[in-house]
């Protein structure tokens, strides 16, 4: 008996010695929208949970994720250290709670515990109001919006590049001419945005001298706009790093202060030269700091989602460096309007945006709008859009009420307070006119968006890449070399210029809505 007891005790001791300790469970580090966030756009399409390590979640556990009050969960995607819950159908002024239940999220270590429950709540924005019902403290932004009106983006042109070398014609467009801009004015456009990529047209440190011939050509094109009586915007465009090694690398700057200081020095040097070249031009010329600064993930990378304020704060610093450089050149640059974008030019990240300090007090906020993506520029290319569109033929969300809410947020928080806001890019892939249904919804979308922009005091710049035909990436309206209409674009351009320029009290956003294509 004694021997048996000793054997049993020895066996228990060995079991305790051989027992493995479970690895620590994955720990939640961040959620977007942030817990307790208010004013969240009803267009918000995802809730992202970030953990301290790479994680996984089974299909069965994905189905256990809940959102209360109930809305549609379109998909759940685990990638690296994040879980993205794609949603649609949020309502105004509603508090939602999203829960990933205990045990659903697991790591990849052996003998590892599952994660604890992850829960977050946020409240959506209030329902949109007509812009006139908010107190308008200043007419400055409204007046500038009227002056800029409907603008034209000369896309895939001076922003085109091969490798690291910018070239006006490398992406297939002919060199622009004075006729291009003269005919734009005749078509009803009031302004042009001239995206410019600089890349290796910038010399080495410390001078960063810009190639004279390239700057001369930019100045010549700006002169075309001046001669045509158009407002013009000039920027730095594809210098941003989109996983391609370009110099405006916000990810590198966000993790290395020395890199950030080096990039800011180059920003100041580049913009000092550009601004100096144009310091005698009138207020019809606007300088825009950047295009769509982001880390290659368009706001969805693990690095960004872990703490969006980190990269957004870097962009805020870069925008300030731009303003300081331009103002220091003097002349008309001391007081001209300057434009600065949100992160990725995405309106959804405006809460992280800080307007640069400006002694002249003449700053403009820029964002881009290609919503809904699956209708405008994505692969799906749905045929329908809006309240009369047929389910299954249109993208989820981003109907008429979405645009009213989105635009009104900028009107209420900026425009009515005297801070101009402009939609630096918008548009939709051309549709085939022979498909009468698709053509009708295409025209309706562009008319509604432009009329909404007009209603809420936002000038809007149509993206035109010069690509003929119809379908994805076909955004050709005006021949860049001649200014002539492309294909069936005149019908669409006339609709948009009328939406922006027609001030008749009988032509309103409501009358456009009422004329939506019949299902």
Regions found by a protein language model. Give the residues of each.
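Acidic, Ser/Thr/Gly/Pro-rich low-complexity segments and short DxT(G/T)-type signature motifs
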Residues: 19-37, 92, 102-128
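Acidic/histidine-rich helix-loop elements
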Residues: 154-176, 204-210, 374-402
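C-terminal motif of bacterial Sec signal peptides marking the signal peptidase cleavage site
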Residues: 8-11
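Aromatic-rich peripheral "rim/lid" segments of glycoside hydrolase catalytic domains that contact
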Residues: 433-519
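Short, surface-exposed alpha-helix to beta-strand junction/turn motifs within ectodomains of secreted
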Residues: 43-76, 103-106
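N-terminal carbohydrate-binding accessory modules
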Residues: 127-191
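Active-site region of glycoside hydrolase catalytic domains
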Residues: 261-399, 405-428, 455-458
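An active-site-proximal structural segment forming one wall of the substrate-binding cleft
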Residues: 172-191, 209-236, 242-289, 316-330
């Amino acid at each position: 008996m004694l021997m048996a007891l000793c054997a049993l005790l020895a066996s228990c001791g060995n079991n305790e010695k051989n027992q493995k300790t479970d690895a620590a469970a994955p720990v939640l580090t961040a959620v977007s929208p942030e817990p307790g966030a208010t004013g969240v756009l009803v267009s918000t399409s995802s809730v992202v949970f970030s953990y301290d390590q790479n994680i996984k979640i089974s299909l069965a556990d994905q189905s256990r994720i809940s959102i209360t009050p109930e809305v549609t969960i379109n998909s759940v995607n685990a990638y690296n250290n994040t879980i993205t819950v794609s949603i649609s159908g949020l309502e105004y002024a509603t508090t939602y709670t999203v829960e990933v239940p205990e045990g659903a999220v697991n790591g990849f270590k052996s003998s590892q515990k599952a994660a604890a429950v992850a829960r977050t709540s946020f409240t959506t924005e209030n329902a949109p109001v007509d812009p006139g019902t908010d107190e308008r403290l200043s007419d400055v932004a409204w007046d500038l919006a009227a002056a800029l009106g409907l603008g034209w983006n000369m896309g895939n042109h001076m922003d085109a590049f091969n490798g690291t070398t910018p070239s006006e014609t490398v992406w297939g467009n002919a060199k622009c001419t004075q006729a291009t801009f003269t005919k734009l004015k005749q078509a009803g456009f009031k302004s042009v945005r001239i995206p410019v990529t600089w890349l290796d047209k910038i010399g080495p440190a410390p001078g960063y001298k810009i190639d004279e011939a390239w700057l001369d050509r930019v100045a010549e094109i700006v002169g075309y706009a001046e001669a045509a009586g158009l407002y013009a915007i000039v920027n730095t465009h594809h210098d941003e790093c989109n996983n391609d090694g370009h110099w405006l690398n916000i990810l590198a700057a966000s993790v290395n202060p020395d890199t950030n200081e080096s990039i800011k020095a180059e920003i100041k040097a580049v913009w000092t030269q550009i601004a100096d070249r144009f310091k005698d031009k009138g207020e019809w010329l606007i300088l825009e700091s950047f295009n769509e600064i982001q880390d290659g993930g368009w706001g969805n990378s693990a690095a960004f989602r872990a703490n969006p304020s980190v990269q957004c704060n870097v962009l805020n610093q870069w925008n300030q460096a731009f303003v300081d450089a331009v103002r220091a050149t003097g002349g008309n640059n001391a007081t001209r309007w300057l434009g600065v974008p949100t992160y990725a030019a995405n309106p959804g990240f405006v809460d992280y945006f800080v307007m640069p300090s400006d002694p002249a007090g003449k700053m403009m906020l820029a964002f881009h709008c290609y919503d809904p993506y699956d209708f405008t520029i994505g692969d799906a290319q749905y045929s329908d859009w809006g309240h009369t569109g047929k389910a299954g033929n249109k993208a989820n969300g981003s109907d008429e009420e979405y645009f009213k809410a989105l635009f009104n947020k900028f009107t209420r928080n900026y425009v009515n307070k005297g801070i101009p806001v402009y939609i630096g890019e918008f548009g939709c892939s051309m549709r085939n006119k022979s498909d009468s249904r698709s053509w009708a919804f295409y025209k309706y979308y562009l008319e509604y968006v432009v009329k909404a922009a007009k209603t809420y005091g936002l000038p809007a710049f149509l993206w035109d890449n010069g690509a003929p035909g119809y379908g994805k990436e076909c955004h050709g309206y005006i021949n860049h070399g001649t200014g002539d209409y492309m294909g069936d674009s005149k019908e669409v351009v006339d609709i948009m210029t009328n939406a922006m320029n027609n001030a008749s009290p009988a032509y309103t956003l409501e009358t456009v809505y009422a004329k939506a294509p019949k299902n």
